[in-house]
C-alpha cells in the first residue's frame, strides 16, 4: 500500500491551512465560553494498567466489580454513529477504547461539544469499564472533558510519517504516531537505568564533571569552541570527561562513573552525531583485564534484564552476549581477516606502508608504525568484528593516555570492544607515570600545532594532579547511543537520539 504523509508541503498545504482555520475558529469559540486548557483534571490510572489488571476478565465480572476509572490522553481516532461514538484514546501506556453516547452525556453536550472536537485533542474521561461484544476492554464514559485543544492536526496514524526529516525534526509527531519509536526510547531509558543499577551494586559512585572546559582533553577529537563574556575567555564543550574523572581518583574516590553528554565537532554519519551520550567509569587498583570482565558482565546483565535474553537480533545477525567475548590482539585480527598480510609485514614500517597503500590508505609522513597499523585495522578489519570482541594491544602511538605494556612498550594496556562491526567501548590501564604522560601530551601538542585539529592540548593542571600520585587505575568508556542502536536493532544513530543534530531548514 502506498504510504502518504499529510504534511507533504505540495499536496497538503491548502488542506492544512483549512484545518488550521477551522480549528482556530473552534478555539476562539471555546475561549469565549471560558473552556480552554483545563488544568485541574486528576487521573487515577493509565491504559496499560487497566489491560494488565482487567484484560482477562469477562464483561459479567466487570459489571459486578463496577470499576470506575479516570483517564486522560490524546484522541487519535473516532467513529461517530449517530447518538453513540467510539474513541481511541492514547496515553503513555498505550491506547484504550472509549464509548460515548448522548444518553450518558446528554444530547446537547454530545452534539454541541463532543462532535466538534478534533483528532489530536487531549481529553480527560470518567467512566466504567466494560467489554464490547467483540471482547474489547472499553470505558463507558459518563463525563468527558476537553483538556487541550490541538490547533494542528496529527499525522494519520495508519500511514504514519514516512519522511525521516519530519521524524527527526518533529520527534513529538513520531512519538504520537509510531508505537515502535515510542517504545524504543522507553527501552533506551531502561538501558541507562540498568547501567546505573549495575554500577551501584558494584559500589560505584556517580559523579559530575564540567561540560564547559578551559582545555578539552581525554580524547583525540576536534572540539566546539564558545566564549565566556564575563571571564573574557574561550571555553570548549567537552570531548570527554576522562582527565577530570582521574583527578577524582587522585582525590581518593576508588570507583566512580559518569553518564553525560560529549561534543565533537566532526562529521555526521549513521553512527556519528556531534552531541552524544557516554558512560565513563574508573576503578582504582585495577587493570584493563579487570575492566574487560566488568564490561562483559555489564552487557550480559543489560541484555538479560532489559531484553529478557542474552541472544539478540541485529539486522541479519544473532548477537550472543551469554558467552565469553572473543579476545584478539590488533595484529592477530588484521592477519586473520587479511590473509595477504602477515604479522612480519606489520612489524616493519616500510612493509606496513606498502600494505596500507595496497588497500588505498593515504599515508601521512608524520605517522609512525603504530598509526599505520591502526589505519589498516580500521579500514579492513573492524567491519568483520560482528560478535562481541575485545581487540587488545593497541599501539602506544594512538593511545596517549594509556599505560605502556610491561613486556612490549610499543603497545598499550588497552582494549576496544567491537560488536556488529562497530566500536562500542574503549578501555585501558591508565597512565600514572607523570613524566611519561607529560612527554606524550607535549608530543600531542606539537602535532596539534602542526595543523592536526584532533590532537590533544598540553594540560598542565592535569600533569600537576598526576604528580600528587594516581594509584594503579583502569577505565572504560561506552557510547550509549551505539549501545542502544545494537540493543534495539536500529541502524541509524538519529533513530535512537530524541533530538539529533540537523542541518538548518532552508
Curated annotation (Swiss-Prot):
Cellular component aspect of the GO annotation: cytosol
Name of the molecule in the record: Lysine--tRNA ligase
Binding site for Mg(2+) 2: 423
UniProt similarity note: Belongs to the class-II aminoacyl-tRNA synthetase family.
Necessary cofactors: Mg(2+)
Species assigned in the record: Baumannia cicadellinicola subsp. Homalodisca coagulata
GO molecular function, one term: magnesium ion binding
Superkingdom of origin organism: Bacteria
Pfam family, one: tRNA_anti-codon
Keywords: Aminoacyl-tRNA synthetase, ATP-binding, Cytoplasm, Ligase, Magnesium, Metal-binding, Nucleotide-binding, Protein biosynthesis
Cofactor binding: number and manner: Binds 3 Mg(2+) ions per subunit.
Compartments, record wording: Cytoplasm
Catalytic activity: tRNA(Lys) + L-lysine + ATP = L-lysyl-tRNA(Lys) + AMP + diphosphate
GO-annotated biological processes: lysyl-tRNA aminoacylation
Gene name tied to this protein: lysS
Amino acid at each position: 500500500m502506498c504510504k502518504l504523509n499529510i504534511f507533504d508541503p505540495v499536496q497538503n498545504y491548502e488542506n492544512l491551512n483549512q484545518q488550521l482555520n477551522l480549528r482556530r475558529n473552534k478555539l476562539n469559540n471555546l475561549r469565549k465560553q471560558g473552556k480552554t486548557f483545563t488544568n485541574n483534571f486528576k487521573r487515577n490510572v493509565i491504559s496499560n494498567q487497566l489491560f494488565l489488571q482487567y484484560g482477562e476478565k469477562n464483561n459479567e465480572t466487570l459489571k459486578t466489580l463496577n470499576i470506575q476509572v479516570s483517564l486522560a490522553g490524546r484522541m487519535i481516532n473516532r467513529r461517530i454513529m449517530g447518538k453513540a461514538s467510539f474513541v481511541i484514546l492514547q496515553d503513555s501506556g498505550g491506547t484504550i477504547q472509549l464509548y460515548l453516547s448522548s444518553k450518558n452525556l446528554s444530547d446537547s453536550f454530545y452534539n454541541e461539544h463532543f462532535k466538534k472536537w478534533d483528532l489530536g485533542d487531549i481529553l480527560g474521561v470518567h467512566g466504567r469499564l466494560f467489554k464490547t461484544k467483540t471482547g474489547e476492554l472499553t470505558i463507558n464514559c459518563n463525563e468527558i472533558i476537553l483538556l487541550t485543544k490541538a490547533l494542528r492536526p496529527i499525522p494519520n496514524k495508519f500511514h504514519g510519517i514516512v519522511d525521516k526529516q519530519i521524524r527527526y525534526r518533529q520527534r513529538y509527531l513520531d512519538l504520537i504516531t509510531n508505537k515502535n519509536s515510542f517504545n524504543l526510547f522507553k527501552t533506551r531509558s531502561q538501558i541507562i537505568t540498568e547501567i546505573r543499577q549495575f554500577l551501584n551494586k558494584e559500589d560505584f559512585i556517580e559523579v559530575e564533571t564540567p561540560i564547559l572546559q578551559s582545555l578539552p582533553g581525554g580524547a583525540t577529537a576536534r572540539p566546539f569552541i564558545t566564549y565566556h563574556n564575563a571571564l573574557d575567555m574561550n571555553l570548549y564543550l567537552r570531548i570527554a570527561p576522562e582527565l577530570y574523572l582521574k583527578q577524582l581518583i587522585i582525590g581518593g574516590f576508588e570507583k566512580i562513573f559518569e553518564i553525560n553528554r560529549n561534543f565533537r565537532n566532526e562529521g555526521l554519519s549513521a553512527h556519528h552525531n556531534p552531541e552524544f551520550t557516554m558512560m565513563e567509569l574508573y576503578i582504582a587498583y585495577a587493570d584493563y583485564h579487570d575492566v574487560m570482565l566488568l564490561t562483559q558482565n555489564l552487557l550480559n546483565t543489560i541484555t538479560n534484564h532489559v531484553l529478557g535474553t542474552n541472544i539478540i537480533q541485529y539486522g541479519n545477525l544473532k548477537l550472543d552476549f551469554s558467552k565469553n567475548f572473543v579476545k584478539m590482539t590488533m595484529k592477530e585480527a588484521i592477519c586473520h581477516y587479511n590473509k595477504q598480510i602477515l604479522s612480519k609485514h606489520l612489524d616493519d614500517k616500510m612493509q606496513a606502508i606498502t600494505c596500507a597503500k595496497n588497500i588505498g590508505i593515504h599515508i601521512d609522513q608524520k605517522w609512525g608504525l603504530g598509526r599505520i597499523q591502526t589505519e589498516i585495522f580500521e579500514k579492513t578489519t573492524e567491519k568483520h568484528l560482528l560478535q562481541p570482541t575485545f581487540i587488545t594491544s593497541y599501539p602506544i602511538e594512538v593511545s596517549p593516555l594509556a599505560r605502556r605494556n610491561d613486556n612490549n612498550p610499543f603497545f598499550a594496556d588497552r582494549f576496544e570492544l567491537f560488536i556488529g562491526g562497530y566500536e562500542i567501548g574503549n578501555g585501558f590501564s591508565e597512565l600514572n607515570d607523570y613524566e611519561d604522560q607529560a612527554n606524550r601530551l607535549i608530543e600531542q601538542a606539537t602535532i596539534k600545532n602542526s595543523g592536526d585539529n584532533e590532537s590533544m592540548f598540553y594540560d598542565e593542571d592535569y600533569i600537576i594532579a598526576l604528580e600528587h600520585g594516581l594509584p594503579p587505575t583502569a577505565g572504560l568508556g561506552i557510547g550509549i547511543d551505539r549501545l542502544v542502536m545494537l540493543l534495539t536493532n536500529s541502524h541509524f544513530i538519529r533513530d535512537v537520539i530524541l533530538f539529533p543534530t540537523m542541518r538548518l531548514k532552508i
